[in-house]
Each structure stands twice: as C-alpha cells, then as structure tokens.
From Swiss-Prot:
Keywords: Nucleus, Phosphoprotein. It comes from the Eukaryota. Component of the chromatin-remodeling INO80 complex, at least composed of ARP4, ARP5, ARP8, RVB1, RVB2, TAF14, NHP10, IES1, IES3, IES4, IES6, ACT1, IES2, IES5 and INO80. This is Ino eighty subunit 5. InterPro entries: Ies5. Its main location: nucleus. It is found in: Nucleus. One of its GO terms (biological process) is DNA repair. The modification Phosphothreonine is found at residue 124. GO terms for cellular component: Ino80 complex; nucleus. Present with 2280 molecules/cell in log phase SD medium.
Length: 125
C-alpha cells in the first residue's frame, strides 16, 4: 500500500483552507450588502416614526429627549422596553458609571457608521 506524501497532504489542506477562506470572504460581502439594505429600511421606518411622533406630540415634550414619546409607546407597547433601557443607560451616565461595550457591538457600530445611506432614507417625502 503506497504511503501518502506529507507534502501532498499539506497542499491538500492548504487548498481546503484557502477555499474556505474564499467562501467566508464572499459570505462577508453578502452579509454587508444585506446589512446595508436592512439599515436603509430601518432608517426609513425611523424617519416615518419620527414624523408621526412630531405630528402628534413633538419630541421636545418628553422628559428626556432621547426617550420614545408616551403617545408612540401607547401605539406600540413593545417599545416600553426600549424606554426602560434608555433610562437605565441615562442613569448610569448621570452617575458617571462606566459602561462596558462588547467588542462585537463596537464592530457593529463601526459598520453602521461606515454604511452609506441614500438621502431619501433619512428624509420624509
């Protein structure tokens, strides 16, 4: 029975790893395109919600400008959780507590900031 040449085994492993790397690079590109599409849609929805909020009550009427207005929370009760989270973060910032941001979240934030949006995504017609 012939023995396998160690160099051919190494070459085969290198080709396999290289092919996997190429596949992951393609997946990364696809995911970034999908993320851009999702971000554009979310930005459009936020713009519409802000215009509804401005028309109903005005964002300046909330105790903390960064909170979602009570009128909007009444329309969509699931948003109350987000107001609770915003309040929690605001309290920590007021008490000068450090907030640890995970590396994955920093990567997502960097990707968010580097994603180009169209003018219409952030402006109502």
């Amino acid at each position: 029975m012939p023995s396998k040449d160690p160099e051919s085994v190494i070459d085969k492993e290198i080709r396999k790893i290289s092919a996997r790397n190429d596949e992951l690079i393609k997946q990364d590109g696809t995911l970034k395109r999908e993320y851009t599409t999702l971000l554009r849609k979310v930005s459009s929805v936020i713009t519409v919600l802000n215009s509804i909020d401005d028309a109903d009550t005005g964002s300046a009427e909330t105790e903390l400008p960064r909170l979602i207005s009570q009128a909007t929370v009444e329309k969509v009760p699931e948003l109350k959780w987000y107001n609770d989270q915003i309040s929690l973060i605001t309290e920590k910032l007021e008490d000068d507590e450090d907030i640890e941001v995970p590396e994955e979240l920093m990567d997502a934030y960097t990707l968010y900031k580097e994603t180009p949006l169209l003018y219409n995504d952030t402006h109502t017609p």
